[in-house]
Amino acid sequence: MPDESQDTPVLDTIAAMTAVSVAECDLAPDALLLVRLAALAAVDARPVSYLLHIGPAAEAGLTIEDAQNVLVAVAPIIGTARVMSAALNIAEALELAIAVIEEDSE
């Protein structure tokens, strides 16, 4: 039987990098997630990248208003197109998260 980690080498690498980053960072969880949200917006991340942060953000007590404030703060730096793309991608990630929760509750 093949090793499961060999089935998802890209995801495994991303998970390992994220774990090291979180372990080595001295920011509070809410601040860390806000910084990561800003970085995702800056690189025009896809919805799945935001989706991976929804659970931890909720656990840290962050709100959609916090996400909006981050986008307002970075807008002059990353530009309107990236901010609008981030807003759409966050909305798509939230829709997917809600769909998964609804499916799991049935």
What are these regions (language model features)?
Residues 1-34, 42-44, 50-59, 82-106:
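Acidic, glycine/proline-rich low-complexity segments that act as flexible tails and inter-domain linkers
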